[in-house]
């Protein structure tokens, strides 16, 4: 592995072709910045993940630049569009003229000082291109690309590691992980996003240092875990998190699913962990994050509700409600937004209702279809079935009902309101709400031809109540 040579390996690659319009705009903006830096005599390259993606012939999300220019020199070149948000660390954000949403991070070559908090260096000193790459996390991310001649510069062995699909720390793995403990999770994330195997020394250090992950901010842990779950290999991500020891620290509720038996007649696949793992493997490409988390958490309440009947049958009574409360606590701990928490916990709480769908009253079924979370719930149900018995008949039934019923039939405007009830002498309170709910259920079941029919029913309902 090359880590000490003063001269990099150089590889000429084909010119990069951008497919998507939004990426093309970002790329063109980065090229303009590089052009300005080169024109004024500065060394400057595309760096990091975007170079890795270009080498792998995939499309980067963003384009970062590393340069010999100091932050003040960068600011002087782009006086109206530079934001020195990371000036103390040599980082400048350069925004595109006319579109502030398009921006490029421009960082000065640097050496990092000691990482006293396990997150950021205590200070930096400006350095050479080689010194800059030697402080980076993984070899695949420690590449520079000179766009003037389409040449990749590699001081750390990143190019052969990409070719072999190996994730390897730059230099000493333990040092890299201690510098920034989030790299423990990033190693798992890159492995499952890129389809790489984690090199043995890197893996050993990851396992030894796993306990330090608890010092990282919950929001940053949440974001890395979400990227793992939404990667092409979420089931493998779960296994890597478990095998490394990270799962027991970050998500002990999920770790507890291992060894939790299930009734074999309904779950021939095995314990709850195996079921959850199989479901993760059934997620669609690039899934919605709420769906991915709902899959992970849907059976989180099973260990706490495990019981056996006298005949030995395993039961998990009310596990969906216990699980929803546990999911809420977990998601709150990871600082999810209120909307995300409500959406995901609703999916956990409601996932057992699907088995009853073919026998539901029309009103109950329509209310189910009208839930704002129903699309996620339906996909969760489909994946739940694929993760055990494979019977998708209820899923097909609900898809058919969605096709048969339009939005007005599923969730019509109520024919009656609270004022209608109160004019008949019923005060605001539980009884009023109960009457309106009865009326809406009847409306959903097409019991009323029009509003007048609903008013007639209401009068009879109130009279019968007051006799």
Where are these regions (language model features)?
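Catalytic cores of the polymerase beta-like nucleotidyltransferase superfamily
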Residues: 1-467
